[in-house]
Amino acid sequence: MKFNIRKLTENDWDTLVSWWDAWPSWVNPPKDFLPDNGTGGLIIEKNNIPIVAGFLYFTNSAAVLLEWIISNPKYKEKDRKEAIETLIKSAEIFCKNNNKKYMFSIGRNKSLINIHKKLNWSIDEKASYEITKQI
């Protein structure tokens, strides 16, 4: 069975919140912190089961940020890693189709970093920090 790749909708929000709440080190971001008020991204499903999602921050440059990749903590099938790879590759295609040339992401999860490496992303081995402020 192949994966279904689609854009996020308002109906996905409660699912995403439940995933963020289930992962102990994650924080649920406010909707208005995310692109298009929580709908600016992609989700990967299999047999109508959502597996992984990520958000695409389009900029006024040739770059797009791929952020807030979150997965279904209850999905334990062997193709979980493949679903994450599909999300990233689909995001790349989506960005290319929108005339973007660069993608940028921030991460600390080793498994996710390794998937990016496998997909030929450049990884800066020096630690960096997300710095935010509500103004």
Where are these regions (language model features)?
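Conserved catalytic-core motifs of GNAT/GCN5-like acyltransferases
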Residues: 122-135
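Conserved beta-strand-loop-alpha-helix junction that forms the acyl-donor binding cleft
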Residues: 103-114
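Conserved acetyl-CoA binding element of GNAT-fold acetyltransferases
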Residues: 62-79, 129
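Conserved active-site tyrosine of GNAT-family acetyltransferases
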Residues: 114-121
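Conserved acetyl-CoA-binding loop-helix of GNAT-fold acetyltransferases
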Residues: 77-93
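Conserved beta-strand in the GNAT
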Residues: 43, 48-58, 64-67
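Short amphipathic alpha-helix that is part of the acyltransferase structural core
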Residues: 1-29, 127
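Active-site rim helix/loop that mediates acceptor-substrate recognition in acyltransferases
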Residues: 17-47
